């Protein structure tokens, strides 16, 4: 088991949150580095992750992405992968209050804006210098480099702002830029490697990756002929990973068994 050095997390610099190409590149770099340093582990591997890590795993399975040329990928497993955040932003974009689940969506949107702004200087200027964000939101921008999603949702951070309080004079313009970027980079649109086993674990109580959107993702993949196994757990976003872990581990080991003829 190896953890990738995601850009800006395992390495210095800003983290392009939910940016599929960066995430898949980190996964493929990890696999190649292990192969060079520890050739005895073999060439076969499985990409797995939770939340943003699930997005990374699915992007790793794309037949057109940075990891497409890395051989030996047996399957991908995504626990509560985030999809259709643009729909959540549209649904809650005018909410006047900061309360669950609005605080979660606000925090998630802030991380996404930060990720997009690391790759788009014009968007960064719009957000921080040209009225895309309110002064209160600009003051909280540094939190995006030091806090995780759960802490960002607190009342002393982005979770203390309603969607309306996040927006500056050009807030609607910034919101549309964010949604356009999300639509273009959504995991729904990935062209996956053919015949690559895909497992998706969803939380029935998930407020970050709502179950109906995750089910829709699985159905869209299946409609394109991708082999998808979907499991649903009675949990919120992060606890889903703990509940899914034993069954997911067995699924991964079965992939290796199929390759090695039953010897692990």
Mark where each language-model region is:
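Conserved alpha/beta-hydrolase
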Residues: 1-11
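Alpha-helix capping and helix-loop boundary segments enriched in small/acidic/polar residues
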Residues: 14-22, 48-52, 169, 173, ...
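Alpha/beta-hydrolase active-site loop
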Residues: 17-38
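Primarily recognizes the serine-hydrolase "nucleophile elbow" in alpha/beta-hydrolase
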Residues: 32-38, 42-104
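Short alpha-helix in the alpha/beta-hydrolase fold that links the catalytic acid
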Residues: 60, 196-198, 210-220
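Accessory cap/linker subdomain of secreted extracellular hydrolases
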Residues: 82-189
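C-terminal catalytic histidine-bearing segment of alpha/beta-hydrolase fold enzymes
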Residues: 170, 174, 179-181, 208, ...
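Short beta-strand/loop motif that positions the catalytic acidic residue
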Residues: 194, 199-206
């Amino acid at each position: 088991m190896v953890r990738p050095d995601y850009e800006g997390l395992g390495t210095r610099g800003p983290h392009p949150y939910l940016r599929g190409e960066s995430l898949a590149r980190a996964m493929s770099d990890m696999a190649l580095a292990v192969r060079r340093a520890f050739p005895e582990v073999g060439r076969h591997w499985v990409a797995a992750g939770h939340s943003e890590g699930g997005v990374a795993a699915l992007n790793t399975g794309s037949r057109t992405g940075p990891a497409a040329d890395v051989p030996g990928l047996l399957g991908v497993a995504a626990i509560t992968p985030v999809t259709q955040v643009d729909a959540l932003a549209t649904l809650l974009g005018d909410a006047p209050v900061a309360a669950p689940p609005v605080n979660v969506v606000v925090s998630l949107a802030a991380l996404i804006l930060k990720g997009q702004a690391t790759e788009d200087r014009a968007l960064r200027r719009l957000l921080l210098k040209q009225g895309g964000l309110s002064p209160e939101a600009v003051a909280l921008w540094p939190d995006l480099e030091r806090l995780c999603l759960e802490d960002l949702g607190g009342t002393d951070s982005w979770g203390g702002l309603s969607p309306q309080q996040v927006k500056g004079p050009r807030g609607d313009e910034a919101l549309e830029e964010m949604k356009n970027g999300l639509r273009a980079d959504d995991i729904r649109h990935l062209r996956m490697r053919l015949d690559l086993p895909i497992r998706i674990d969803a939380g029935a109580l998930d407020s970050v990756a709502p179950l109906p959107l995750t089910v829709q993702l699985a159905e869209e993949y299946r409609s394109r002929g991708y082999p998808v196994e979907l499991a649903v757990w009675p949990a919120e976003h992060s606890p889903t990973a703990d509940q899914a872990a034993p069954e997911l581990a067995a699924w991964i080991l079965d992939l290796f068994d199929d390759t090695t003829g039953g010897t692990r």
